Amino acid sequence: MAASARGSGRAPTRRLLVLLLLPLLWAPAGVRAGPEEDLSHRNQEPPAPAQQLQPQPAAVQGLEPARAEKGFTPAAPVHTNREDAATQANLGFIHAFVAAISVIIVSELGDKTFFIAAIMAMRYNRLTVLAGAMLALALMTCLSVLFGYATTVIPRVYTYYVSTALFAIFGIRMLREGLKMSPDEGQEELEEVQAELKKKDEEFQRTKLLNGPDVETGTSTAIPQKKWLHFISPIFVQALTLTFLAEWGDRSQLTTIVLAAREDPYGVAVGGTVGHCLCTGLAVIGGRMIAQKISVRTVTIIGGIVFLAFAFSALFISPESGF
């Protein structure tokens, strides 16, 4: 009985101990679990934003054709107008340069200014003659370009087709003149220039004699001269004036004016000056030999063909193209 009473007294005591230990065992687990959950939420970083440069998966790439079918088109590359304007300006300059140099060459070979430079180079210093002639031709080219550029106040459509008509008229006229010329046409113009230069030389020699001392009295009967003639060679002045007067109103001047009205003025100025330099250089270096070898008739016919070619090109090049 005593043993049973002891066992029955221990049973409630054990139950009481178990009930007291259960909260102690559960509380640490719950307290530890709570902070771990909070810390896990705190340490969890927000998702990184998707980078647009990363390659898209196949599933996303498969949507591109569908977007294109629905009207979504990729953005076209943007082209600036500066590159197009620069390219057009370069083409306009090159076209004007080629047109001017070709027209001047076919117009000046065998022309009066060509023979003036050739004959004067045979008598005087070649460098002086070349300098005087080139200065006159450069001045004439610049003036012609300014005259042609002044017409740009008129709408380009009108000046373009008027200049085309003038090219056609010049071409037909040169062809008619070339076909009617005799084979000795160049020799006749050469003799005419020689006679004119001979007359100028006689006047120059007469002026020198008048400025010299008198044989009987020993005094000089000097004619008053301009001071700048003492610093500039008379040969240079003669080449300058003869070339300028011969070129004024010539076919090459009219051609330069027409070209400057429809082409790039800078290209026309540079091309015309280079063309005159080539022709005058050949005349000064070659002299009479080139003058005798050149067939003025052939050069005139070729020039007429070149002028007609420029007129014919207007059928394929619009005035708005810029060249």
UniProtKB/Swiss-Prot annotation:
Q: Which gene encodes it?
A: Tmem165
Pfam families of this UniProt entry? Answer: GDT1
The UniProt entry's coiled-coil ranges are 184-211
Biological classification of the source: Eukaryota, Metazoa, Chordata, Craniata, Vertebrata
Question: Which Gene Ontology molecular function entries are recorded, alphabetically?
Answer: antiporter activity; calcium ion transmembrane transporter activity; manganese ion transmembrane transporter activity
Q: Which organism is it from?
A: Rattus norvegicus
Q: Any keyword Thylakoid?
A: no
Q: Which residues form the signal peptide?
A: 1-33
Q: Transmembrane region positions?
A: 89-109, 127-147, 152-172, 228-248, 267-287, 299-319
The record's function comment reads: Putative divalent cation:proton antiporter that exchanges calcium or manganese ions for protons across the Golgi membrane. Mediates the reversible transport of calcium or manganese to the Golgi lumen driven by the proton gradient and possibly the membrane potential generated by V-ATPase. Provides calcium or manganese cofactors to resident Golgi enzymes and contributes to the maintenance of an acidic luminal Golgi pH required for proper functioning of the secretory pathway. Promotes Ca(2+) storage within the Golgi lumen of the mammary epithelial cells to be then secreted into milk.
What is this protein's record name? Answer: Putative divalent cation/proton antiporter TMEM165
**InterPro entries documented for this protein:** GDT1-like, GDT1-like_CS
Q: Which family does it belong to?
A: Belongs to the GDT1 family.
